[in-house]
Amino acid sequence: MPRAIFEEDAAQLKLGPEFENEDMLTVSEAKILIETVLAQRARETNGEIPMTDVMKKTVAYFNVFARFKTAEATYACERILGNRFHKFERAQLGTLCCEDAEEARTLIPSLANKIDDQNLQGILDELSTLRKFQD
């Protein structure tokens, strides 16, 4: 019997079966997760953490592209985004930090009929303010 073909479409939040029950992180959340794991390993090995080239590059990537640099700012971002969005949309909004609603809708098409421009812009403005005033 032929298997059904799953048509992926991020605009409709059809991300594939492997993503159905998984959480999605912003780059800032992933940065905190990696930092926490590395700190735990440092405590367990008296400060000596063997880092592969991949891990070094991953940490460097997070340091460059994480929009929220501290745990406090990242948690504040989570609070701003709340549960209004699908986990994929939340991760994208928190990672991309779009300047305006039009940009957000272009980059995250699934937002099209979910929230009006005024409310979306308000959320984006809160994220922008948070980025400016993070520690």
From Swiss-Prot:
One of its GO terms (molecular function) is translation initiation factor binding. It is found in: Nucleus. Keywords: DNA-directed RNA polymerase, Nucleus, Transcription. GO terms for cellular component: nucleus; RNA polymerase II, core complex; RNA polymerase II, holoenzyme. GO terms for biological process: transcription by RNA polymerase II; transcription initiation at RNA polymerase II promoter. Component of the RNA polymerase II (Pol II) complex consisting of 12 subunits. RPB4 and RPB7 form a Pol II subcomplex. DNA-dependent RNA polymerase catalyzes the transcription of DNA into RNA using the four ribonucleoside triphosphates as substrates. Component of RNA polymerase II which synthesizes mRNA precursors and many functional non-coding RNAs. Pol II is the central component of the basal RNA polymerase II transcription machinery. It is composed of mobile elements that move relative to each other. RPB4 is part of a subcomplex with RPB7 that binds to a pocket formed by RPB1, RPB2 and RPB6 at the base of the clamp element. Belongs to the eukaryotic RPB4 RNA polymerase subunit family. This is DNA-directed RNA polymerase II subunit rpb4. It comes from Schizosaccharomyces pombe (strain 972 / ATCC 24843).
